[in-house]
Amino acid sequence: FNSTPDVPLLLFWTLSILCLYKAIFEDKKWFWIIAGITMGLAFNSKYTALLLQIGVLAFLIFSSKYRKLLISPWLWMGLVISVVITFPVWWWNYQNEFASFAFQSSERTSSIGKFEIKPTLFFGAVGHQLFLLLPVLFSICIVFSYKHIKKALTKFTLPSQKTLFLLAFFIPTFIGFFLISPVYWVKLNWMMPSYITGIIIAGMYISKKLLKAQLIISIVFHIAVASQVVFYFVPIKSDDTWLGWKELGEKVEKVSENDSEAFIFSIDGYKTSAQLRFFSTKTVFAQNVINQPALQFDYLGDIMDDYKGKNAFYIDSDKRYKNKEKLGELPQMITPYFESYVELDPIIVDEGTIKERKFWVFYCKNYQPKK
């Protein structure tokens, strides 16, 4: 079974909100404990879940009726339990120089800190959220966010307690990511948790006419997407596709039969290497071969010095595939790590179909790791 972290995040985010609702509005104290467990599991899935604790505390601070719960031992017991549940994440980070925390915080905040405003990033975020929610629902989310924020800032008026509760888990994520989008690329899935409560609020605003329009657009959109999935009308010029990876793994196995001791590597981020590691029995690496950060490949226990003197097969996808010609030369960043290389014929998967993809192949000799 293979999954992105967003799947368990959305599951435990939803369960956390349900439990917090019962704990607060139905005064079922044991649900604070369950909420603590689910919030912890949500954080273990993805660090975005920290916004759950922030959301519940923000709600209680702004809620005149339920502010008294800030001194409730049940609230703090739930929060402590949520931290305890995250212990495996903290322990792993402690053992690995806080690598995942650094990746999610310092590396990304340094990019944001440069504060280079790029309108294309903002409009890109708007575009992919329009794609995710479709125009009617997305527009309603924008409208009610504006109305509630305007009332709070100009009239110091807050909505009903239950609406405020829903907003506490929507506004920080939805507005927060849009605020940083002009200076940092916000990915399509980052705002998804906010829509768990955001869509409920949208239901309070949508008219029957708009609901009908959303339904029609949704049906047309899903038919179009399903047709693309089944018939693949439009080729995807990217590694962001599920097509061809299994066949690539099989063909790489065949190409490497002449040197069974050779390892496989790619340096295009992590996708090609990750797919080959999944679909191949060969030893597969990423940028760690050339002494560069390689995300998860840095923590699989491999010591590159152990592969000194071995040969390797370098695999790289031709994302803008136009012909079946060879690349011509090995990328310069790789050549210092090998004595010599020979370019082999490219691997073509799903040949003769619209799904056809191309991968360059180099046979690199005598690996010399460097510090």
Predicted regions and their residues:
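Short acidic/glycine- and proline-prone juxtamembrane loop motifs at membrane-interface regions
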Residues: 1-8
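Residue-level signature of transmembrane alpha-helical entry/exit and packing/kink sites
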Residues: 6, 31-35, 48, 74-78, ...
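Transmembrane alpha-helices of multi-pass, membrane-embedded glycan-processing enzymes
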Residues: 9-12, 16, 131, 198
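Membrane-interface transmembrane helices that cradle and orient dolichyl/undecaprenyl
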Residues: 16-31
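Transmembrane helices and adjacent periplasmic/lumenal helix-loop junctions
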Residues: 33-62
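Transmembrane-lumen/periplasm boundary regions of multi-pass, lipid-linked membrane glycan transferases
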Residues: 53-163, 169-178
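Hydrophobic/aromatic-rich transmembrane helices and adjacent perimembrane loops
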Residues: 132-135, 139, 164-167, 171-174, ...
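Membrane-proximal, lumen/periplasm-facing interface regions of secretory-pathway glyco-
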Residues: 184, 188, 211-260, 269-285, ...
